[in-house]
Regions:
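Eukaryotic intrinsically disordered, low-complexity regulatory linkers and tails enriched in Ser/Thr/Pro
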Residues: 1-93, 100-148
Length: 148
């Protein structure tokens, strides 16, 4: 597949070989001929903004600019966060709303999604927990502002 827009069904976007991605949805896995960052950028554009605009919005809302969570689409509260610097090829993007729980697995984090899918993430539990907390803060501010 050469194009993909993130939806409320998307759980994670994982880089694989040849600058492609494995996109995990609730009931499906799709191989996309784009990097995770390209999919994030395309999805931001699809919903009327740009990645840089969304990143600037995150900084304005919660003051985070490094490994910042991104609001892909506001009305459905689709928020993704990176597992490393988004500039790095190995960066995965995780959907906040689909996480059931996460736990430490050796030196990494294991993410358990509501659908039953699990993903071992190449980052420490503490770093993953921090990313979830940042994304949750962003979600909270977004909900508050939507209800004003």
């Amino acid at each position: 597949m050469s194009t993909y827009e993130i939806s409320s069904e998307t759980l994670a976007i994982i880089p694989i070989e040849n600058f492609c991605s494995r996109v995990v949805e609730k009931d499906n896995t799709i191989i996309v001929n784009k990097t995770p960052m390209q999919i994030i950028e395309d999805s931001c554009s699809f919903f009327g903004s740009s990645y840089f605009g969304r990143a600037k919005g995150t900084k304005g809302l919660i003051g985070v600019s490094h490994k910042a969570p991104i609001i892909i689409e506001e009305s459905k509260e689709i928020i993704f966060f990176p597992t490393s610097s988004p500039r790095l090829y190995e960066c995965c993007w995780i959907s906040l709303k689909h996480i059931n729980r996460y736990q430490k697995q050796e030196s990494n984090a294991l993410v358990l999604f509501n659908s039953g899918y699990s993903l071992a993430v190449d980052m420490s539990y503490g770093s993953f927990d921090n990313q979830v907390l940042r994304a949750t803060r962003l979600e909270s501010v977004l909900r508050f502002r939507k209800n004003i």
